């Protein structure tokens, strides 16, 4: 079991909910469930495998995002990453510009809608 990764993920989940509430005015069911799968995956498998499964199946990641709600969750995730992840200090707009410019047509309107 990867206790440090579980603690890290729990801290990120808390930050996600705080940013979600700040931006949307409320928390969503998806916000409460955000990255919860990782907590359980870290209990039964190594980091690389858990990370791969999570990214391939979670709709708030670029491989699976399809709906407006998916992109809202993605932007919130990008925006809150800098609060708990020392290695990810960009905000949502910077993340879009530097890492995912191919998503600009879908994600930039969401960033602007959220006032970021």
Range-by-range predicted roles:
Residues 1-116:
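Metal-dependent phosphohydrolase cores
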């Amino acid at each position: 079991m990867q206790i440090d990764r579980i603690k890290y993920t729990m801290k990120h989940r808390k930050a996600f909910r705080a940013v979600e509430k700040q931006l949307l005015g409320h928390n969503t069911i998806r916000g409460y469930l955000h990255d919860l799968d990782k907590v359980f995956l870290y209990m039964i498998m190594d980091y690389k495998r858990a990370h791969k499964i999570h990214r391939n199946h979670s709709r708030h990641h670029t491989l699976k995002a399809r709906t407006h709600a998916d992109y809202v969750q993605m932007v919130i995730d990008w925006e809150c990453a800098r609060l708990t992840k020392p290695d990810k200090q960009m905000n949502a707009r910077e993340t879009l510009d530097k890492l995912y410019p191919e998503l600009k047509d879908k994600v930039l309107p969401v960033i602007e809608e959220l006032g970021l």
